[in-house]
A protein has these predicted regions:
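Junction motif at the cytosolic side of a transmembrane helix
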Residues: 162-166, 233-247
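Central hydrophobic cores of alpha-helical transmembrane segments
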Residues: 171-184, 201-204
Length: 247
């Protein structure tokens, strides 16, 4: 009512109305939701996966310590082939580790808390998804979260790999990454989502690893009449940054 046509606030109101229109026919009712709720709230499996990915990246650069990198990089096309092989191995390892960790955690949560029979019910039956604007079932959301979190983990792993390339000593690279992660964690927990600096909260390594919090919520960014979901902006920036770093 009090916003001006052509402003972001006005455009955001219209966009919000359109987005929630998608779930206007979703009927919410009480069911066995604790299995999915506890699983989506649990995030340690993502950090454990990232710890394993860091160890794999660290192992990639063992030749920096034994001097074999000179032979590898000095051969015809050696550096390019080696980089392609490492990229392929890293993506496959990320997919394998994440798949095992993700689905084993999901199964354990469902066995412990119940809810297998209600997986086809709307995800909005879980209170924390009250602002989720897509008419998905619980199992559909779990599969969506799997795909999105896999993209995030692989992108972050590739960025770390590219960062290791910048350092002659892999131990220095590891130390810098750990310090950066600690700073990101501090920022993530000390900048509120309503702050004018909330971009540092959302485009943050902690938020990217535990992407469910952003995926399941509703918030838009934009300027003028251009309105974009925060989640879409985060994934777009992550993919662009990954391509730039790997290139």
């Amino acid at each position: 009512i009090f916003t001006k046509a052509g402003s972001f606030s006005y455009a955001n109101i219209l966009r919000t109305s359109e987005d929630f229109e998608r779930v206007k026919n979703v009927e919410v009712f009480k069911d066995e939701y604790k299995g999915v709720k506890n699983f989506t709230s649990y995030y340690y499996q993502y950090f454990f996966t990232m710890a394993l990915m860091i160890s794999i990246v660290y192992a990639f650069f063992a030749q920096r310590d034994n001097g074999m990198w000179v032979l590898t990089y000095g051969s015809s096309g050696g550096r390019a082939r080696y980089a392609l092989k490492q990229t392929f191995v890293l993506i496959c390892a990320g997919a394998l580790i994440h798949t095992i960790m993700y689905w084993s955690t999901f199964i354990c949560s469902m066995l412990q808390n119940g809810g297998f029979a209600d997986l086809n019910n709307p995800i909005q039956n879980v209170e924390q998804f009250a602002k989720f604007t897509y008419p998905l079932s619980k199992i559909q959301y779990v599969m969506l979260l799997y795909c999105v979190s896999l993209i995030c983990i692989n992108c972050i792993s590739l960025i770390m790999w590219a960062f290791f390339v910048l350092f002659r000593n892999r131990n220095y690279a590891l130390i810098v990454i750990l310090i950066f992660s600690a700073i990101e964690q501090f920022i993530y927990y000390h900048i509120d989502v309503h702050s004018v600096w909330n971009v540092l909260h959302y485009i943050n390594i902690i938020n990217l690893i535990n992407i469910n919090g952003t995926l399941s919520s509703y918030r838009n960014w934009g300027t003028g009449t251009f309105v974009f979901p925060v989640f879409s902006v985060i994934i777009f920036v992550l993919i662009i940054l990954t391509c730039v770093m790997v290139y």
